[in-house]
Amino acid sequence: MTAATVRGGTPRDSVVSVSNRWEGAGVNKGYAVYCDADPYFYDAPHRTADRTGAARSRYAAASSPVPEGWQRHESGDWLALRPADADLPAQGWKIHVSACLDNAESVLDRVWRHCVDGGTAFKFVPSRYLLHQRNAKYADRAGSGKFVTVYPADEAEFERLVGELSELLAGEPGPHILSDLRIGDGPVHVRYGGFTRRDCYDADGELRPAVSGPDGVLVPDLRGPVFRIPEWVDPPAFLRPHLDARSAVTVTGMPYTVESALHFSNGGGVYLARDTRTGARVVLKEARPHAGLAADGADAVTRLHRERRALERLSGLACTPEVLDHRTVGEHHFLVLEHIDGKPLNTFFARRHPLIEADPGERRLAEYTDWALDVHARVERAVAEVHARGVVFNDLHLFNIMVRDDDSVALLDFEAAHHVDEAGRQIVANPGFVAPPDRRGVAVDRYALACLRIVLFLPLTSLLAVDRHKAAHLAEVVAEQFPVDRAFLDAAVEEITRVDGSTRVDGSTRADETTRADETTRLDVTTRVHGAPDAARRPAGPVAPVRPDDWPRSRDSMAAAIRASATPSRTDRLFPGDIAQFATAGGGLAFAHGAAGVLYALAESGAGRDEDGEQWLLERTKRPPSGMPLGFHDGLAGLAWTLERLGHRDRALDLAELLLDQPLDHLGPDLHGGTAGLGLALESLAATTGQAALHSAALHCAELAADGLPGGSVPADRVSRGRARAGLLYGGAGRALLFLRLFERTRDSALLDLARDALRQDLARCVRGAGGALQVDEGWRTMPYLGAGSVGIGMVLDDYLAHRADEEFARAANEIVAAAQAMFYAQPGLYRGVAGMVLHLGRTTATAPGTGPRAVRRQLDALSWHAMSYRDRLAFPGEQMMRLSMDLSTGTAGCLLAVASVLGDAPAGLPFLPPPRRSGGPLTRPHQEP
């Protein structure tokens, strides 16, 4: 139940002006598991069974009658059973049992009988599909392998059950659960943690599952991919041999010294190492048995052997690494490969791309085009050489292409490779390169090469998961921006959009025999980015029904798409949005990703109130979800503020009363979920209702938000809690916004001083990049965005400068404008994409060049590059762009609000950041200008 805001970016060693915008080339693997349940929207994985053949994979035990005197509860990925009179502790030692796909049902039947006969509470993953998903290559490593959880009543029963289950399941294979201590070499594991759900805030103000320490104070129950025992817990003596055995297995006996980790997945790690015998650098690829499953069920060890066979067949080619060694340590397998000295293509070409600049010249565009075409030709030749040796690569994408200093290329990661005589489909894939399921053999590689033609110029092919015909639009944009031969792009579009189930093993096709690709029934738990039902068969035409700058048609179209997506029968969410809806209690209601933010955007943009949606929210807030955070973007404060804004004062005040009853000193100081957001909401409610208690609470929030500032009054033991962050949602800018709004209410200049100090803290975490653009430096990447980047700081700087002149701040505000002027941003969203740039450029009072209507129009045009269609209405993709989103933070509602801020008759704005007063009315519609 973490307040998850997914963050991405490229490495900090990239050129500053590049790294902040190229995160679309990176992939947050956590999103993939939310793609199976719906072809258009992210949804909870357990809902997949409602629309696919996954329901047939449900274990018989999941449908068995509830034993007499027992209670049954199914939630998410788990089905729990417990005796009605069970008296379990809140925390303690619990037992996890792992299993493979083939023995899981047998393991479950035995554990079920043992627990029911003994009156022991337990829960289990109820279907083969969900178990496959939990053990997939890029599933959450902290939860990987967990199939059955058993809850002993005390330590004596814990020891007894560990022994009995170990004997009962002796010899059964199962993956090692990384978060647990393994008992012997079987599938039984143990861990100390919470039995019942309790929550506390961690050092960063994030809500986490909790256990209580010896003093009764709740602390985070750490659930990472590493076995940990709380420092106050003494493990039972019978665990000592297993703890010793765990420590005994190391790689010290191998003639390789690990220098750094390059990558982790459920299947194991990839490490940069050095051969101690020769001093040469090598790459170690680790594989864990029964873990890291691909779509075909192959585990990491099976795929490692596939890679070894493929690379040995390709030995001698300059475009593939040599196999140097193969080792086994315990049950872990290691493949030792030649180290290719170069950089992955995603980072290499990002340094060169001209669209990250505000105004690249013709020469710059031409030079980049020549380089990109040369790289594609080299990759195409490399793939042809691989095919000539009888191997299909089957996983070509930017991260698997290494570019050396001389621009020669090498292909990496052959774990999905197979012989050309096998008509194999993709079993692992990058979302931007997922071939349709009708492609087999070398046709998979040809599809990836076609995607690469577009990605080298415009890395937005993840959108093809929703509609493959988006390729034609992307090609048009590329042709408009770069001097590239249109035939080069047309060939890519033809390959991407064709529908041909008759693809032969050698990749040839029969053009006169086309069949519809069934993109909705492929149960693929690794790629999870199948297209929408009409993605392959829809006739060519505009992917988006209207341009964003065609106002008010675009407003009406976006609003219609949002309303068409509503699911009022659901209790967890009304509008589909980011996966964060499922990470926090009440996430589907909250302002950032839930109904509150969407309803706000509809009302503020002039699209009209959604009375049915408001009634849905009122019904769900009669009794807010247990464990819902308190914050503005993620919790109760945002709900209270939104309902007051929409005219539902009684419910707003009910929620405000809940806030007043809660201790707040454990919260972080930020705007997203901390005291800055609470203070702003409470002060706004105080102003509209006249309730003095709300104003007093807002002032208390300001005191807490002053944590760590020179003028703050918070005790020293609370100063500088958590990691330092900058920006509107998580940094000093959000706190400064609270101080500014309270200053406007009280005229207390000390609050203005606090705002100054908070903004200075944020500016101290910024760096200047190419063109003088000021961006937040996170240590390994830089960020220009509205939520966690410099543009959000610029919004608050503008408001501060309205009250007090400051030369340093005025200069910074102008430099931040440059961060909002690039020609390309990887995502469209409000807080992490183009929409935020539109909103800032339309609102800023900075005087730097690039703040006028022309700059806004250019970003509106860039926003159109991401535009999609949902039921023939304008919609936008969410985070990672594998599915559409309707929420405010990442999706269509946020884009609607941003466009309304510059084109609406009554300009819209973010909460607490009102739009500027414009004497001349809305911006001239770009499509109406000469």
UniProtKB/Swiss-Prot annotation:
Biased composition (Basic and acidic residues): 501-527, 547-556
SMART domains xref list: LANC_like, S_TKc
Gene Ontology terms: biological process: peptide modification
Bilayer-spanning residue ranges: 447-467
Superkingdom, natural source: Bacteria
Residue ranges occupied by any Protein kinase domain in the UniProt entry: 256-516
Gene3D superfamilies listed in its UniProt record: 1.50.10.20, Phosphorylase Kinase, domain 1, Transferase(Phosphotransferase) domain 1
InterPro entries: Aerial_hyphae_peptide-synth (IPR053524), Kinase-like_dom_sf (IPR011009), LANC-like (IPR007822), Prot_kinase_dom (IPR000719)
Binding of ATP, residues: L262, H263, F264, S265, N266, G267, G268, G269, V270, K285
Biased composition (Low complexity): 532-546
Compartments reported by the entry: Cell membrane
Keywords: ATP-binding, Cell membrane, Kinase, Membrane, Nucleotide-binding, Serine/threonine-protein kinase, Transferase, Transmembrane, Transmembrane helix
SUPFAM superfamilies noted in UniProt: LanC-like, Protein kinase-like (PK-like)
Effect noted on mutating D413A: Does not restore aerial hyphae formation to a ramC deletion
Signal sequence, start to end: none
Induction (free text): Expressed in substrate hyphae and very immature aerial hyphae. Expression commences by 24 hours after germination, is maximal at 36 hours and has disappeared by 72 hours; expression is higher in wild-type strain J1501 versus M145 (at protein level). Requires bldD, cprA and ramR for expression, deletion of bldM or bldN increases accumulation of RamC. Probably part of the ramC-ramS-ramA-ramB operon. Transcribed from 23 to about 40 hours after germination, requires ramR for expression.
Outcome after substituting D395A: Does not restore aerial hyphae formation to a ramC deletion
GO MF term set: ATP binding; protein serine/threonine kinase activity
Membrane protein topology class: Single-pass membrane protein
Keyword flag Ubl conjugation: no
Annotated stretches, region: Disordered: 501-558, 911-930
Cystine crosslinks: none
Family, similarity comment: In the N-terminal section; belongs to the protein kinase superfamily.
NCBIfam families on file: lanthi_synth_III (NF038151)
UniProt protein name: Probable SapB synthase
UniProt source species: Streptomyces coelicolor (strain ATCC BAA-471 / A3(2) / M145)
UniProt gene name: ramC
